[in-house]
Amino acid sequence: MNDAPSTVGMIIFMTALGLLPFIIVTMTAFLKISVVMFIIRNAIGLQQTPPTLVLYSIALILTVFVSLPLMEDISNRLSARPLDVSSLDKLQASANVVKEPVKAHLMRYAKPGEREFFLSATARIWPPATRANVKDDDFIILLPAFVSSELTRAFEIGFLLFLPFLVIDIIVSNILMAMGMMMVSPTLISLPLKLFLFVAVDGWSRLMHGLILSYG
């Protein structure tokens, strides 16, 4: 019987470990940062460079940097009240300690309009008994609102990043057509120009700085 708490704790730890990728992708800056990174790679025209693993690693590093205050807050709360898995009630009490900073984080970056939509959507797709006590600060509302808000911001940034590279593609294509060089692939000419532009404006630094400061 003495091994029961440790067994329960191990099960909870393994479950939390399995959910960690889901938590990182849906509750942190990783979602927006990774999407922007892939958009800029496609905008330049480099299909495999930087490699996908490198882009995910950059996104993860920047996510840790941005989320450090949140992680520190959670760590301090758990230090003040260590996680207790000896019973479900104590486990729930410990989880409530962590819940507040995470909820505040999601509230900060989830657009009010998205929260209102998902709250109103419950009236259309949930039965009355299920939606009776739902509020706009519940996780079931905050999480999809946060994901939708982050994706919207990511594509807004991606659109602005795409424009100058699109202009280069159009100019190069028109010049080649005017010169009668239709057999020459525009990518052969535009890719070095886009790389030069990105390097000349210190693209990676500016991109990462902007993504980090967007959470200020």
Where are these regions (language model features)?
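Hydrophobic alpha-helical segments and their helix-loop boundaries in membrane
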Residues: M1-G216
